[in-house]
């Protein structure tokens, strides 16, 4: 571990869980060293007078004693501890905070709902790829934050008094997962949302990002069940029906839902359905970071980059000493191929971005060894922290790199869920051809080519006489033609 002065810690005393994040700054980004999360369920200790019970406070202090051990290594000026909704509400919050500060040896700041929303947005802006005009949704234990913004700037932010713990106690107190309880929870959530919905819709968004445990749980369920990672209202309604079918909270079993998340899953699901319905959200993806990341980046005073993915790719290229000129050369050829076939194949812009990203990293496996370089590349990409890329996108990149040469493993292309299997196959074909035609590692030796698609048939036209003048190239293309034919990818080269 580096010198202690390079370490930063962010602690979030949430209504459901307490979290600690310890990082160090690396090349304009952060490297995570420690993440500790403990379910404290502080909000469950609030009574009708908003008094926090002694038992709930003791659970919180016990957790902070664990955190305090790690904080001894970090300068106090590089630690931020914030408390959110439950400690905003609790009339005896001062008692809890006084002892918490004594345990941690540093100040604990109770932040407003608006400040919490702003920090969540900053965490998302620093760690999440895609369009920069976004709506961010975070459902915590006792509050829900909704923020619109562009780039680093928020345009509207709201903190609403509803959360997965408070809605659990209010609408699922009998642990019954019947339609009536869901209807009541959703109706109440929609009433809370209605006063702010118009302003949020007025500011608008191109992408919607979820930054909470509920959204994380949904992502895990979808990955476990082989669905794509995009959260839609249809999928939420299907999961609600599955929960209703289970009958009771203690009997809730859904593939991919952990026991730890199950208790507050139905209440969080009801709130999320209300948000989708009231704001007419088409699709949501998981954020790369939220409140804790916002705190850390705030301490580091790092500017928000417009393109998180580009920063990530640059950092990885430097770290693994990838030949950047060659990566760019392959990317240029792949982009040219993509642009020629995108209309026939009905490819989306995100597919182009992911293909170019695969090109930028395709030689990363050489940093381990030439032998089995594609396998090494796939392993590294699957396991590296790649801010800006979702888990499913990381899996797709790893799968493309695994299949960049040699016989194609079709099943691996079908097991990823970032894009439809057919699109993954098409991106793989373009990547393989781009690598072949940039293999001489000189711009002036990349031939002028046209690529046409007719359904699955690819027709590649080279300059006249090129195959005769390049016998090794001709042999490599013949081998590639054979490998593609094994998986029924027709390729004609003229």
Swiss-Prot record:
GO biological processes: guanosine pentaphosphate catabolic process; guanosine tetraphosphate biosynthetic process; nucleobase-containing small molecule interconversion
E.C. number: 3.6.1.40
Family in the record: Belongs to the GppA/Ppx family. GppA subfamily.
Keyword Hydrolase found: yes
PANTHER family recorded: EXOPOLYPHOSPHATASE (PTHR30005), RETROGRADE REGULATION PROTEIN 2 (PTHR30005:SF0)
Function: Catalyzes the conversion of pppGpp to ppGpp. Guanosine pentaphosphate (pppGpp) is a cytoplasmic signaling molecule which together with ppGpp controls the 'stringent response', an adaptive process that allows bacteria to respond to amino acid starvation, resulting in the coordinated regulation of numerous cellular activities.
Pfam families membership: Ppx-GppA, Ppx-GppA_III
Alphabetical UniProt keywords: Hydrolase
Keyword Hydrolase: yes
Enzyme class: hydrolase
Superkingdom in the source lineage: Bacteria
NCBIfam families named in the record: PRK11031.1
InterPro entries in alphabetical order: ATPase_NBD, GppA/Ppx_hydrolase, Guo-5TP_3DP_PyrP, Ppx_GppA_C, Ppx_GppA_N, PyroPPase_GppA_Ppx
Catalytic activity: guanosine 3'-diphosphate 5'-triphosphate + H2O = guanosine 3',5'-bis(diphosphate) + phosphate + H(+)
Pathway involvement of the protein, from the record: Purine metabolism; ppGpp biosynthesis; ppGpp from GTP: step 2/2
GO molecular function term, any single one: guanosine-5'-triphosphate,3'-diphosphate diphosphatase activity
Name this protein carries in UniProt: Guanosine-5'-triphosphate,3'-diphosphate pyrophosphatase
């Amino acid at each position: 571990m580096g010198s202690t002065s390079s370490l930063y810690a962010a602690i979030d005393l949430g209504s459901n869980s307490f979290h600690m994040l310890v990082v160090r700054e690396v090349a304009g980004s952060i490297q995570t060293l420690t993440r500790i999360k403990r379910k404290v369920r502080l909000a469950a200790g609030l009574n009708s007078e908003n008094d926090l019970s002694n038992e709930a406070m003791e659970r919180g202090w016990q957790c902070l004693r664990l955190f305090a051990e790690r904080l001894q290594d970090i300068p106090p000026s590089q630690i931020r501890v914030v408390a959110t909704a439950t400690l905003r509400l609790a009339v005896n919050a001062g008692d809890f905070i006084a002892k918490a500060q004594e345990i941690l040896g540093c100040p604990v700041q109770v932040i407003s709902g608006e400040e919490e929303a702003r920090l969540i947005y900053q965490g998302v802006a620093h760690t999440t790829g895609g369009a920069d005009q976004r709506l961010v949704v975070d459902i915590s234990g006792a509050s829900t934050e909704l923020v619109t913004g562009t780039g680093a700037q928020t345009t509207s932010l709201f903190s609403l008094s509803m959360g997965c713990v408070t809605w659990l106690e209010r609408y699922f107190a009998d642990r019954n997962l019947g339609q009536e309880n869901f209807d009541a929870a959703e109706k109440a959530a929609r009433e809370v949302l209605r006063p702010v919905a118009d302003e949020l819709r007025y500011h608008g968004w191109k992408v919607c990002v979820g930054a909470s445990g509920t959204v994380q749980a949904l992502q895990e369920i979808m990955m476990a069940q082989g669905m794509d990672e995009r959260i839609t209202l249809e999928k939420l309604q299907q999961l609600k029906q599955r929960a209703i079918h289970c009958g009771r909270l203690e009997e809730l079993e859904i593939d991919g839902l952990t026991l730890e998340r199950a208790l507050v899953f139905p209440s969080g699901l009801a709130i999320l359905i209300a948000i989708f319905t009231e704001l007419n959200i088409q699709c949501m993806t998981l954020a790369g970071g939220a409140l804790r990341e916002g705190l850390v980046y705030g301490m580091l005073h790092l500017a928000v980059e417009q393109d998180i993915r580009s920063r990530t790719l640059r950092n990885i290229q430097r770290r693994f000493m990838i030949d950047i000129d060659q990566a760019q050369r392959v990317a240029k050829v792949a982009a040219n191929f993509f642009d020629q076939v995108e209309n026939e194949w009905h490819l989306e812009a995100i597919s182009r971005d992911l293909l170019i990203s695969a090109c930028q990293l395709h030689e990363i496996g050489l940093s381990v060894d030439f032998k089995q370089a594609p396998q090494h590349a796939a392993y590294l990409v699957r396991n590296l922290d790649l801010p800006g890329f979702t888990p499913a996108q990381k899996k797709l990149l790893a799968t493309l790199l695994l299949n960049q040469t040699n016989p194609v493993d079709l099943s691996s292309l079908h097991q990823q869920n970032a894009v439809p299997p057919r699109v993954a196959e098409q991106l793989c074909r373009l990547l393989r051809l781009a690598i072949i035609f940039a293999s001489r590692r000189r711009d002036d030796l990349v031939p002028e080519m046209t690529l046409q698609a007719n359904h699955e048939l690819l027709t590649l036209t080279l300059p006249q006489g090129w195959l005769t003048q390049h016998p090794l190239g001709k042999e490599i293309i013949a081998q590639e033609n054979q490998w593609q034919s094994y998986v029924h990818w027709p390729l004609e080269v003229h």
